[in-house]
Amino acid sequence: VLDTGKNVPSQRIESLFSLSQFIELVVPIGSERKFVSAIIVPNFDACIAYFDAKGIPYDKSAVVYDNNLGPAPVCVKVGKDFVENEEFKKLIDKEVQTVNKELESYEQIKKYFVVDYKFTEATGEMTPTLKVKRRVVMEKFKEEIDALYK
């Protein structure tokens, strides 16, 4: 519930982002706030394929893969240069705007930030059943979240 009294069900926002090719996970934030913001975890494998197809350079030495998350290695971390790349920012922003078109104005994500690693059980943000540990995420990214509301 926003501080305006409007109720914004995070499941609705999360389910709309589940259709995105380039965004793996979104953690909507809005409780007792003026507007909805979000933490975005990209689908790094899809984003890397996009970068490679477009010939967009990035620091390949900063990319980390995990062989334990499925049948094929999964990208779990990229370098800061990757998430700060202008093409990448446009790509993610386009995905956010696509979802925002499906939402009421008070439900729309007004500000967000993108993390450079995949949330997993090993990094502490996910449960064994792959549910987001919201309290952990809110504590871990407190400064970044507060900055969105300044």
Locations of the language-model features?
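AMP-binding adenylation
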Residues: V1-K150
